[in-house]
Amino acid sequence: MKTFSAKSHEVVHEWFVIDATDKVLGRVASEVALRLRGKHKPEYTPHVDTGDFIVVINSSKLRVTGTKGLNKIYYRHSGYPGGISSTNFDKMQDRFPGRALEKAVKGMLPKGPLGYAMIKKLKVYGDANHPHAAQQPKALEI
């Protein structure tokens, strides 16, 4: 029997919506990364984008365990000397709800053109409203 290899034009990308209210950041991120990659499908092929579109709502209500709210630090650099800045999880959630989830999922995806295409299929919204009702996303429970 020949090994099956999915073709990019034959893959069906479904839409799912996840409610992140009171969910732990890492557990949501790992499930989202798995679904974006397509590893939950039997026709998964490593070199083809077989994943689904994921819409995450209520990302402002994500939580972390222990003292990570204060102790988990996110760094970024402007490119200039001395241009490093840092913020913790709580401040990032207040300013940019959902960015912590995007960064967590991005770190779990492959680096390169395929990974960059996968992260574009993630849509994160801080509240319950999203503009993807026309795609009729199915609810996904984590």
UniProtKB/Swiss-Prot annotation:
One protein family per Pfam: Ribosomal_L13
Gene Ontology molecular functions: mRNA binding; structural constituent of ribosome
Gene3D superfamilies attached to this UniProt entry: Ribosomal protein L13
GO biological process, one term: translation
Keyword terms, alphabetized: Ribonucleoprotein, Ribosomal protein
A cellular-component GO term for this protein: cytosolic large ribosomal subunit
InterPro entries: Ribosomal_uL13 (IPR005822), Ribosomal_uL13_bac-type (IPR005823), Ribosomal_uL13_sf (IPR036899)
SUPFAM superfamilies (alphabetical): Ribosomal protein L13 (SSF52161)
Function: This protein is one of the early assembly proteins of the 50S ribosomal subunit, although it is not seen to bind rRNA by itself. It is important during the early stages of 50S assembly.
Family recorded in the similarity comment: Belongs to the universal ribosomal protein uL13 family.
UniProt-listed PANTHER family: LARGE RIBOSOMAL SUBUNIT PROTEIN UL13M, RIBOSOMAL PROTEIN L13
Quaternary data: Part of the 50S ribosomal subunit.
Name of the molecule in the record: Large ribosomal subunit protein uL13
The gene coding this protein: rplM
